[in-house]
Regions:
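Bacterial N-terminal signal peptides
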Residues: 9-18
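Boundary at the C-terminal end of the N-terminal hydrophobic targeting segment
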Residues: 21-25
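Conserved positions at the start
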Residues: 55, 108-110, 174-176, 238-240, ...
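Extracellular glycan-binding segments that recognize GlcNAc-based cell-wall polysaccharides
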Residues: 354-480
Length: 480
């Protein structure tokens, strides 16, 4: 059987950040931004999961008590747990879809609850005129709701609609919005998706009057001049409508799922209007197809990305202690096999420009059979695995002007617990099926990098990766 390999001369990013230097706020060095994305943790899901049909946001109620929000079948659910990432408890319905003919006749989705005083305020995505099997037909709009305990929510008040009428056989309207609270400004900003142009827009309202539709104004021709209900709006481009606020950098964070960009795209803005996009994806992927006949067959699927403060809840974050959430369908899965994933993020400005801004954690897991799996992907059968250690950080895209190698993961056709990491094309002819690209490595040594080696475990009878030639005393170098 042909064995593929990764040369021990490939190099990946160091585990440790460079020393921080103070950068003047008025001169932000975009290429000095350094982001480390940690291993993905599967916290909920499996066959016939009823929810996970929206961005997953979390609020903190008290010490050791958090509440997250999911949706499915047109209704919104709350899930309570002791930590932001501990979301395995039963889901409770907290908001139901509206009556026939209403803006929410097809469903409601609670997005991005934020705390204002003693009240939790949430954007509520609404849909009407739906016929999903007819080209995904639906018409989107947005409401706002509030709650004192995160369980009892008032019926949403519609505050944002499109000037266009519903269309047959396609998505229309404006929706899928997320809220962000501006520090020291007294405004709530709502970033939304406009399917007719496949772009994003923004509206805002004073915190003191967010429940009044007339208070919400869309950005149009550079000013907050248009009514959010039925008004026109400027295009922000395709930055995404999943947002948060980075307090250390005083910038809005926007996330988008963009296969043409190469994965989860991160954009930042200091004025709520003009965004720049980080050149590297946070998590790489090249396909994101919702075709029910293709899901799980040719690749995995990432959907509904969100921003969560893992320590305090909400979506206002610091350099560390926050993460992204998303719904995940693994390679070989179906639309009913959805998993909720939390993935920690550390982000800061360093003293010099970076060749690559993002590093993605490569982690070794041990199966109860003794076999190792080394991956950057979510491990969905997590109860069968023990997390062992982070090996290094991989690149999330090729670096221009420097030789890199694409790294892919594959699984043995005869043994679903036997995984192989190889360079691109190495799965072919090896008796394995390709799962996905899990990152890139430098072909030759670079500053602040470490080598990785392919090793063989006689106990598990499979290959794994290590950052040292001693293979962490778990096996021997594989020189094939």
């Amino acid at each position: 059987m042909k064995k593929s390999m990764i040369s021990c001369l490939c190099f990946v990013l160091l585990l440790h950040f460079l020393l921080v230097s103070k950068v003047a706020a008025e001169v932000f060095c975009e290429s000095c931004l350094q982001v480390r994305v940690e291993r993905p943790l599967v916290v909920r899901g499996g066959s016939h999961e009823p929810g996970l049909d929206t961005k997953f946001y979390v609020i903190k109620l008290s010490e050791n008590l958090f509440r997250g929000y999911s949706s499915g079948g047109g209704d919104a659910y709350a899930i309570t747990g002791p930590e932001a990432w501990s979301m395995g408890w039963p889901a409770n319905k907290v908001l139901s879809k509206g009556a026939a003919g209403s803006y929410s006749e097809c469903g409601v989705w609670i997005n991005s609850p934020v705390k204002i005083g003693d009240v939790y305020v949430a954007a509520v995505h609404q849909e009407q005129k739906c016929d999903y099997i007819n080209g995904g037909q639906t018409h989107k709009s947005m409401g706002v709701s509030f709650s004192y305990d995160g369980l009892s929510w008032v019926n949403p008040i519609t505050v944002l609609t499109s000037p266009e009428a519903p269309k047959m056989g396609t998505q229309s309207g404006e929706g899928d919005c997320s809220l962000v609270r501006a520090p020291d400004e007294g405004y709530l900003y709502m970033y939304c998706f406009r399917p007719g142009r496949w772009d994003n827009i923004v509206a805002r309202a004073p915190e003191a009057s967010y429940m009044f539709p007339s208070s919400w104004r869309k950005l149009y021709k550079g000013n907050w001049s248009e009514p959010a209900v039925g008004g026109m709006a400027d295009s922000l481009g395709t930055i995404g409508s999943s947002v948060g606020y980075w307090r250390a950098g005083r910038k809005v964070i926007a996330l988008d799922l963009d296969p043409w960009f190469g994965g989860i795209k991160l954009s930042l803005s200091s004025d709520y209007k003009n965004f720049f996009t980080l050149k590297d994806p946070l998590v790489p992927f090249v396909k994101n197809d919702w075709d029910r006949n293709l899901i799980g067959k040719s690749t995995d699927l990432i959907a509904y990305v969100g921003v969560v403060n893992l320590l305090g809840g909400g979506n206002r974050v610091d350099n560390s202690g926050w993460g992204i959430t998303y719904t995940y369908i693994p390679h070989g899965g179906t639309l009913k096999e959805k998993y909720l994933v939390f993935q920690g993020v550390n982000m800061k400005v360093v003293s010099e420009p970076q060749q690559a801004s993002v590093g993605l954690a490569l982690t070794r897991w041990e199966h109860r059979s003794g076999k190792y799996r080394v991956t950057t992907l979510p491990v969905v059968r997590q109860s069968e695995y023990t997390e062992r250690n982070r090996i290094a950080y991989l690149l999330t895209r090729p670096v221009v002007g420097i030789e890199t190698l694409e790294v892919e993961e594959c699984v043995n056709r005869q043994d679903p617990d036997d995984y192989l990491v190889t360079d691109a094309g190495g799965c072919d002819g090896s008796g394995h099926d390709r799962i996905a690209t899990i990152g890139w490595v430098y072909k030759y040594p670079q500053k602040n990098t470490v080598p990785i080696y392919r090793c063989y475990s006689p106990l598990g009878e499979n290959h794994f990766l290590s950052s040292n030639a001693g293979c962490d005393d778990l096996g021997s170098l594989d020189m094939v």
